[in-house]
Amino acid sequence: PASCTSIGDYAFDGCQALTAFSVAEGNSAYCAEDGVLFSADQSMLIRYPQAREETGYAVPDACRTLGDWSFIGASTLEQIDLNQVTAIGEDCFYYCTALKNIAVPDGVTQLNGAVFAYCTSLEQVTLPDTMQTLGDYCFYSDVALADINIPDGVTQLGEKCFYNCGALLELSLPASITEIGEKALGYYTNADGKDDQRIDKLNIRNEGSAAVRAYERSWKHASLWKWLLAGGIAVVVAGGITVIVLVHRSRNRIRTTTRQASATKPGKRK
């Protein structure tokens, strides 16, 4: 109605049959363009109808901001042209399961929240040179994602940013990165529903970041420590002394037994 001047968070959450918005003439706060809800001046896209059947959409040139949850659940969209957008809200494309590729425009500096989470058909993402932050759960469970550039200037990868991205087998990370969140990349949930499994085939190319180096070191040893905690044997060689560590688990407690297997002087073979 013309009298509506405020729409609260989650106002259209779960409206899975909604195909179009209409705004009464004379409304000073909102307008509808081709069935999509905008602020009155079209500078912000507020909500794309979840049940709209089109496979492609171009954001109007006047629009600069995509609001939080604005495309959530738009399951038929395969292509989206973001045009002049400079800000993208949290969970913006959450569960856009048909989306195949996306080019984020110049001017966008951060992707906070689960912006592209569960975009299960998303294969390629192009990020601009202005990008600085990829937030928590940004590309969570984008199982088809195989190609993404991380530009120099990005400083942060949030917690589980690329979690469960099993098709992403090679990733170059710039020297500008100073912070990487827990399990940001290299982990997935397997077919049996077991979380935090390591993606062994992932090749991380570090372009000089100390944070990446530390994360990669931790990630590479993750499977060994998980195996040890489950109960196993570690063989450690240091200073010519071979030590066997037996790890036992009983009633959620861990007990270790250390045995010296051999002592060999450096440079001398048995």
Regions found by a protein language model. Name each.
Residues P1-S6, C15-G35, A40-T65, A74-A87, ...:
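Structural signature of tandem-repeat unit edges
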Residues K100, N112, N149, K160, ...:
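Intrinsically disordered, low-complexity polyampholyte segments enriched for Lys and acidic residues
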Residues W227-L246:
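Selective detector of the "anchor" transmembrane alpha-helix that sits immediately C-terminal
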Residues N252-K270:
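Cytoplasmic C-terminal tails of single-pass
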Residues A214-L228:
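Short, aromatic-rich amphipathic segments at membrane interfaces
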